[in-house]
């Protein structure tokens, strides 16, 4: 769904979908067929969404290489902290330049 509206599903639904795919995988010819069935049963608009949840669960469990959910959250937090520190640093540089200019002025 590139460029389309994004719908957030509750974590409980995501976890349930992943469990259901694992449970019914053997009843289908392919993983995609199981994923499509689960998406239909749970009312998830796009089977690709469920596929992504399954892949992320595999990464989180260490069964597939990639960035875990925990690592992604930490990266997001660190990037936010870094941006905040850069803003604070820019403010401090501006303030120090201002005060340095004040000190260089001759006293009246």
Swiss-Prot record:
Protein name: Insertion element IS6110 uncharacterized 12.0 kDa protein
Gene3D superfamilies to which the protein is assigned, alphabetical: Winged helix-like DNA-binding domain superfamily/Winged helix DNA-binding domain
Pfam families named among the record's database cross-references: HTH_Tnp_1
Signal as UniProt keyword: no
Xref: InterPro entries: Homeodomain-like_sf, Transposase_8, WH-like_DNA-bd_sf
Keyword NAD: no
GO molecular function, one term: transposase activity
A GO BP annotation: DNA transposition
SUPFAM superfamilies in the record: Homeodomain-like (SSF46689)
Family to which the UniProt record says this protein belongs: Belongs to the transposase 8 family.
A cellular-component GO term for this protein: plasma membrane
Lineage: superkingdom: Bacteria
UniProt keyword list: Transposable element
